[in-house]
């Protein structure tokens, strides 16, 4: 079952959205020192990547990369302690931090290692980008995202999370908002981290069910369920089907134009059947009919044709309705990210330079309540700290008092840290339990 997180994550502080606190990319470099010094969760970040020091050199051999101002990219960084990493972050104030694999030797010595570095472990990661849904969303495109198209990410997280837990037995999964238009999934179980290249390829291929057929107007998503649909496809269908009408027919009105009707027709993977369906729709639908009417007409025709034992609709198209629903709503994975051992992925709690938003963790059990349009920006966070301190004067009165409230608790970033720390507690409990068995 999806991971449960305390109710605190849903108790977002009041957010300031006035133009006065709008994010300006030109002053990001001026704000990052304050963010890294006062808000970035250095200790939880270290606790995650060190995994309780359960394995030799698991932290010190981890490759970290920084992207600095003016696109200066520094790879092969590594650190022996949490203090070293924190000092370097606060000194360089990177615009982005990327996390790579744990190597067989310290990455900083890569030039002197015969044969180069060899990765020995790495979290199993998934990257889902909203731009891969541009062909099936009409509300936004490119870097744009709104609450309507965020529902594609809601379904992606739900489908993928339950598959990873039920089909592979993974437990320690953290979901991260990418800061702009996508989501990242980190699977941190020991077995996942130690998968070899073939194992990662197998997992990626198992979960990547969408294929594409080329037509004059572009690529058409396809999902073949076969004569005996796999249980994972049946489970995914149970998740996406209840939201199909809301997302595809209402929010996106995907079939509400001639181009949209063509998208639907192109998903019928039989030339003769497609031609028959097109003729039927031309006779029974007006141009520009709402998607709901188009879909109802399609369902009516498909059901009537299934009664013919000689028709493709009763054989290879018998699951066409479910295949279209999955083809439009199933997670669209960048499988090269998952298959690759050396891929570096953006770290949680980075600031996206284009939007200024924090790459915050979220709970999959509350993903439908997650609003990407109100994720706090660095500008907003610094204002929230100042507003809190001006009100309480606690920061000025007790700068060295260890009992004073932590800065992230003064801001709307707090709920993301709560999600992350709850994930860490479960991960660390599991590691302690495993160590007691030896």
Swiss-Prot record:
Active site per UniProt: 63, 127, 129
Gene Ontology CC terms: alpha DNA polymerase:primase complex
Any one GO MF annotation of this record: metal ion binding
Activity regulation, short description: The presence of the regulatory subunit Prim2 accelerates the kinetics of initiation and primer extension.
Keywords linked to the UniProt accession: DNA replication, DNA-directed RNA polymerase, Metal-binding, Nucleotidyltransferase, Primosome, Transcription, Transferase, Zinc
Signal peptide, first to last residue: none
Tissue spec. comment: Expressed in embryos (at protein level).
Other remarks in the entry: The bound zinc ion is not a cofactor. It is bound to a zinc knuckle motif that may be involved in sequence recognition and the binding of ssDNA.
Similarity remark: Belongs to the eukaryotic-type primase small subunit family.
Protein name: DNA primase small subunit
Taxonomic lineage: Eukaryota, Metazoa, Ecdysozoa, Arthropoda, Hexapoda
Recorded name of the encoding gene: Prim1
